[in-house]
Amino acid sequence: MSRTYRIAVIGGDGIGPEVTEAGLVVLGAAEQRFDFRTDRTTLGWSAEAYIRGARVSAEMIEPLRAYDAILLGAIGHPDAPRGLPEHDIIFGLRRGLDLYVNLRPIVLYDDRLTPLRGRTTKDIDLVIVRENTEDVYGRPVARTAEGTADETVKSEMIFTRRGTERIVRYGFELARRRRKRLTLVDKSNALRLQEIYRTVLAELARGFPDVESDAMYVDAASMWLVLHPERFDVVVTTNLFGDIISDLGAAVVGGLGTGASGNIHPGKVSVFEPIHGSAPKYAGQGVASPVGAIGAVALMLEHLGESEAARAIDAALRDGFRTGRIKGVDAGSGRTMDVAEAVARSVRDGPPGRDAGPPG
């Protein structure tokens, strides 16, 4: 009997629905080959709906716990209040479902994509594990003496032992399955409250003697990510710094169009999405790159335990760049559905990639 997974699909705004549909084409090919199926439900959550007054409430998020995964396209609209729809939908999902891991693989699919001279696919293969629910994100902002010389704006940065322990432990467990190296990235020399991360790192490291671990300040880590990306395997970091260095990592492997991310609670419903935005100027033209959305499908399948299917998608993406069926990741480098169909054919018909490891 084939396995069945319940998937909620949120296309969102701009190019989001198009690239999500492309990802579903590849998902369908994986279903055919690897003997599982998905039962998909489409949700109309978007920034455009937010403009019309729609809001995502806790009562709307709660039923999603019955699903196995959520596939998200992109959220954002030029006429929406800046950041508010994203906060409503994306932060709503993260907080409501306690998706405490943001997983961002930084993988170079083809040597020609990186701007770093002399680097190859063998040099750049790391995963950024970003804490996804604490730090400064979503905190209240207090403003006093507004409009005067004494105007002051305050918020708060929060780290808990529970939140720190579970994200560092996740990083160690992931490193154990990969190349057994973990690097903590913080700024505890200036932000003393981040010392809790180093304390927890030292405590948990004793339970993972087979994993080499160290810590770097975020400014140094940013430099090393560009100069020596090969020294990184699993990078664990805070919410704010993870947001920044994961985009730097994306630039190292060719740009935001290459990347996918998972907002994960291990063993529970989790959200998977490309890392690019909604790019409204390209919406409806059929020229958006679906590479990130296809990568998100691979991450989702890995989370669901369909590792062989995830590896096949990863191998198909690599093969697409190698053969020229995927010419790039910028808008206009290929037709969205042409790329999706090419990857789907490779997934459906080709052998699993022997050299391609799991996405995360």
Feature locations, PLM:
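Glycine-rich phosphate/diphosphate-binding loop of Rossmann-like nucleotide-binding domains
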Residues: 8-25, 29-31, 148-219
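Short acidic loop-to-helix transition motifs that present clustered carboxylates
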Residues: 46, 111, 216-223
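N-terminal glycine-rich phosphate/adenylate-binding segment common to multiple enzyme folds
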Residues: 50-154, 240
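Internal helix-turn-beta structural module
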Residues: 283, 303-360
